[in-house]
Amino acid sequence: MRVRLGNIMAAKLNFSDIAWRSEVGLQRQGNEDSALVSNSLLAVADGMGGYVGGEIASRTVIEKLIQLLPTLENPELDNESREDLLSSSIESMDAAIAEIGAARPELVGMGTTLTSIALFDSNLLLLHLGDSRAYRLRGKKIEQLSHDHTVVQELIDQGRLNPDEIADHPQRSFLTQALMGKENLSPILLAYPVLKGDRYLLCSDGLTAVLDEAQIAKAMQQDLTSAVNSLIDLTYKAGAPDNVTVIVAEIGESK
């Protein structure tokens, strides 16, 4: 799915403040999450396929995004070209994972989610695949911008499952889309206008599996460092069965 938004002529807005943390879950031996935090691009990748394989897969896609950054930040590039670059980057990430799997058979089956937001010319570009999430807090209203690529979300979309039944569903963690080196991917690429004061949250499902939107929204109304620490603390208080990565960024005017 792809929605484009043309250049918006207004006061240039950027990520004026960013805070983040990544922690190991209480039932995990290592952290398979990877993250990217820069002035213009934020991303969370949640690896799967065993600790070693999952960590390699998530790190691989983050490294691909880092390699893409200089091109994305070229001031002569327009937003449509940036959207094309982000969209095509999914193929190169997936190919890189496939190449690693071919060279190391013990890693076949590894994979990762990817949820990223890029901010250029006061336009926010969301690139999403899997069940990590992106939220926007505007005032006191929180909105999920990403859409889970999971079996249970498909059932909800089809009207065959109620959202309050997710926690007990045997396939609650089954993904329908992930970067696993198997091609045939349909990432979400969406564009949003931003407002000064907007806050954006990127997180792995280690957070959203145990916290609801009301808890997330309340925590995000604190200063950014406190917001991140509160979200992590609440996750641990809820049992933290999975690794948890949280990035919170606020929109402000360029200096």
Give the residues covered by each predicted segment:
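PP2C/PPM-type serine/threonine phosphatase catalytic domain
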Residues: 2-255
